Amino acid sequence: SQYVYSAGSDSSDDSKSNYYDDAKKLVKRAGKLEKKEKIDKAKKLYSQAFKKLEKAYSSEKKNPDILNYMGYTSRKIGNFEQAEKFYLTGLSIKPDHNGINEYLGELYVQTNRLDKANERLDVLKNCNCEEYKELELIIKTRGSKVY
């Protein structure tokens, strides 16, 4: 969701949404490092992003996008149990969230729960979206294609 602030607003007023934006930038940078196989550096950025997401979440408990990124960053640093909790909390707010359904499916592939991954794929089947195609490929290749 977008936030609009009046021109006279104090910078501290909009810092909450900036945590989320900053976290997204860190995630993007971490993804680029991962592609270059700089995994340790990527994990550090994912951890930094997670800390910013926690701050964003503290003021926006009902934002499924923040929960999606919290799940994503947790999964990327190897904390699968925590990631699953964030994804499931996000789905309890917005069950048809394409990103959460895809990433939760990827987590299920990573943790050898293909039946559950296929359930997420089934939720996405009518979305006509990239998330469906990506999860379908990951399931078919058992995760040999990048998560």
Language-model regions, residue ranges each:
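Residue-level recognition of tetratricopeptide repeat
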Residues: 63, 97, 129-132
